[in-house]
């Protein structure tokens, strides 16, 4: 069975699905674009507001183009960014909190919206993903003795 190609059109369909099913009460007060960004080890998604274009841009980690990453993990990342949009971060909505992750508001909001299965799938995947990362070994720099001569 062929699965759809993971490209920006696929991301837009995932965003549309999540917004329609779980965020239908949230007004889209500006244009919202979504696309894959560059691959990164630790940042899976981001949202930013471009006031010149009156648009919000959601960037999803380019690593998520790989079908080895479960769809639920991609959906979790998109939903996470939609919660930021809902709470007024990088969107024209009124800011509801002083900090975007204050007191676990993202997971609380996602649970209220019936997205607990995405949280569970994401945390399970994240545990395995972290194990797959090679530990970074840093050599300690040896300290050189510097002699200062006073003349």
Model-derived features: positions:
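Active-site-proximal or metal-binding-adjacent scaffold patches in catalytic folds
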Residues: 1-75, 85-151
């Amino acid at each position: 069975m062929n699965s759809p190609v993971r490209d920006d059109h696929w991301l837009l369909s995932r965003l549309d699905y999540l917004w329609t099913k779980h965020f239908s009460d949230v007004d889209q007060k500006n244009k919202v674009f979504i696309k894959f960004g560059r691959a990164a080890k630790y940042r899976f998604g981001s949202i930013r507001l471009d006031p010149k274009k009156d648009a919000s841009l959601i960037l999803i980690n380019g690593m998520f183009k790989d079908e080895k990453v479960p769809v639920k993990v991609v959906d979790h990342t998109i939903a996470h960014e939609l919660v930021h949009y809902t709470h007024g971060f990088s969107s024209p909505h009124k800011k509801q909190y002083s900090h975007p992750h204050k007191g676990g508001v993202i997971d609380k909001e996602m649970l209220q919206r019936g997205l607990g299965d995405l949280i569970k799938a994401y945390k399970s995947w994240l545990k395995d993903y972290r194990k797959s990362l090679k530990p970074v070994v840093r050599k300690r720099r040896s300290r050189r003795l510097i002699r200062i001569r006073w003349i």
